[in-house]
């Protein structure tokens, strides 16, 4: 009896978001029949919700403008911040593990061509975000602080976002005959007697044959509570990625004996904690911190860090372990602002200040600081066991008053002596336009001495995890013998990241997805056909 398949193609791509679309479109462009399976009922994944900025050193728009960006400068920037404790500029791999260095080299060497390919084949229209700084542009090692970001362009010439990226890439895929099937969650892979991957299984006993290979582009495991607790110690809540990011490739890798790497790392962002508790799939992270007359404090009323730095680095202070108290005392912290910020920054995107007519259920209000503290502690109490053991300390109000007095003095002077808020270009970029602030530092304005005051509960979240099996530059997933498993590939957050602990810039996810999507497509299209018999799949 012959094998019955629900679909058969040269290439099966799993996951119809950024990495998946880039892989599928390139594979089809190279002449391969391609099936694209998506677990949700619509395509786009987390990429649909994103700004869709792609960070690509030496991109073609930089070249057209004559902006120099050497391979050496790009590699130094990547290596220095990905692995700060290991970085060695004199070492052949800059101090990085060889496989990470190889991946970063492949990204730098192929990124410009990968982006230009999508443009040349008509899959995307893009424009240059040449005013967008790298997140560590204030460090001397960053020789090219601006110009590496490329963004989608709408038909009217305006900047696009993840919705536009998804629209264009879906159209490009369909134009090339890619068979897109939504509501097809993949559960595992099929192998032949030689151990080669020859297809996948999906829900409802559906099976799909991949003659040359299967490419997983399924995202990380940020919404898998068990995996997140196991590998991230329960510290990070699920972020703004789509709920279908359940770590399916983790399970596949375990079954095939593929080692898992960097499972304790994540791309992070602060997030409004009570929004997380609602399980709203439309949730977004706090990618910007609105306001100048605002601070973020812990349960002692003390600031925890620079409120204006990048979202990943704003998450790090939340994870500080208090040795004396043996606790993560900043795990829930509190954005606190006055009426100036509440009015002037109302409805600012990616922030916590609601629009004047917006939903205020995530905001606690008080006519005085005393009233605000009482209301905030009552809100924490109402969360019960979900408050992560955090209540306001008895000295919160005293600490807060002292903190506001110190912040106000620094705002008048224009220098944040504690956390250098406003010093870096990225602080000022995320702050946005200077709004009616007469003080020297545009990111700081004294908080009002009278109410009302407002607060929101903030937690650190995993935008997406960075761990998984190791992959070659061509996406081949390495098995227990450190050799690629024939027929199995991975691109994106489902495989181990080479960027270590860092979030180097906006677009550091899209840029590599676009690059490695092309490289994986080339590799799988060139791979030999894997033979399979019905008896081997029984």
What are the residue ranges of the model-derived segments?
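Extreme N-terminal leader/targeting segments of oxidoreductases
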Residues: 1-11, 29, 499, 503, ...
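Conserved redox-cofactor binding core of oxidoreductases
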Residues: 96-205, 225-226, 273-274, 404-447
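Glycine-rich loop(s) and the adjacent beta-strand/alpha-helix scaffold that form part
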Residues: 208-277, 283, 510, 516-519
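N-terminal Rossmann-like FAD-binding beta1-loop-alpha1 element of flavoenzymes
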Residues: 11-36
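Core beta-strand elements of the Rossmann-like FAD/NAD(P) dinucleotide-binding domain
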Residues: 6-9, 203-213, 484
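Glycine-rich FAD pyrophosphate-binding loop
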Residues: 29-50
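An anion/pyrophosphate-binding glycine-rich loop and adjacent beta-alpha core
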Residues: 250-252, 259-395
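A glycine-rich dinucleotide-binding beta-alpha-beta segment and adjacent secondary-structure elements
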Residues: 188, 389-498, 502
């Amino acid at each position: 009896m012959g094998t019955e398949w629900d679909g058969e193609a040269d290439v099966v791509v799993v996951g119809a978001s950024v990495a998946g679309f880039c892989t599928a479109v390139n594979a089809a462009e190279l002449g391969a029949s391609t099936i694209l399976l998506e677990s949700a009922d619509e395509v786009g994944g987390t990429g649909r919700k994103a700004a869709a900025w792609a960070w690509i050193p030496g991109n073609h728009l930089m070249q057209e403008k004559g902006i120099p960006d050497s391979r050496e400068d790009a590699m130094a920037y990547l290596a220095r911040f990905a692995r700060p404790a290991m970085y060695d500029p004199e070492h052949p791999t800059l101090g990085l593990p060889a496989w990470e260095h190889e991946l970063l080299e492949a990204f730098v060497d192929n990124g410009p061509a990968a982006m230009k390919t999508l443009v040349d084949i008509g899959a995307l229209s893009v424009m240059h975000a040449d005013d967008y700084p790298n997140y560590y542009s204030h460090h001397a090692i960053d020789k090219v602080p601006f110009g590496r970001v490329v963004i989608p362009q709408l038909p009217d010439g305006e900047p696009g976002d993840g919705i536009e990226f998804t629209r264009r890439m879906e159209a490009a895929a369909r134009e090339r005959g890619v068979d897109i099937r939504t509501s097809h969650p993949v559960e595992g892979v099929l192998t032949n007697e030689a151990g080669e991957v020859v297809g996948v299984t999906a829900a409802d006993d559906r099976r799909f044959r991949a003659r040359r290979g299967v490419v997983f582009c399924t995202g990380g495991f940020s919404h898998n509570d068990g995996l997140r607790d196991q590998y991230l110690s329960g510290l990070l809540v699920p972020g703004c990625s789509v709920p279908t990011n359940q770590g399916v490739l983790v399970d596949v890798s375990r079954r095939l004996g593929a080692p898992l790497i960097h499972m304790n790392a994540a791309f992070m962002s602060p997030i409004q904690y009570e929004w997380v508790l609602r399980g709203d799939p439309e949730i977004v992270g706090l990618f910007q911190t609105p306001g100048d007359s605002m601070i973020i404090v812990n349960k002692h009323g003390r600031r925890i860090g620079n409120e204006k730095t990048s979202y990943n680095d704003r998450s790090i202070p939340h994870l500080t372990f208090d040795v004396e108290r043996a606790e993560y005392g900043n795990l829930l912290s509190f954005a606190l602002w006055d009426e100036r910020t509440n009015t002037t920054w109302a409805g600012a995107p990616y922030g916590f200040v609601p629009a004047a007519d917006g939903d205020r259920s995530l905001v606690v209000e008080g006519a005085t600081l005393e009233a605000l503290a009482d209301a905030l502690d009552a809100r924490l109490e109402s969360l019960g066991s979900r408050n992560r053991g955090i209540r306001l300390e008895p000295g919160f109000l005293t600490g807060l008053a002292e903190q506001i007095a110190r912040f106000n003095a620094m705002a008048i002077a224009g220098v944040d002596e504690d956390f250098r808020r406003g010093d870096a270009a990225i602080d000022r970029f995320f702050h946005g336009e200077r709004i009616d602030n007469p003080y020297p530092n545009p990111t700081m304005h004294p908080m009002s001495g009278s109410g009302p005051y407002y607060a929101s509960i903030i937690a650190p979240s995993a935008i997406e995890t960075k761990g998984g099996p190791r992959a070659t530059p061509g996406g081949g997933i390495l098995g227990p013998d450190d050799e690629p498993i024939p027929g199995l590939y991975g691109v994106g957050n489902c495989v181990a990241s080479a960027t270590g602990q860092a979030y180097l810039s906006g677009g550091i996810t899209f840029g590599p997805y676009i690059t490695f999507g092309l490289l994986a497509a080339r590799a799988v299209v060139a791979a030999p056909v894997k033979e399979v018999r019905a008896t081997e799949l029984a």
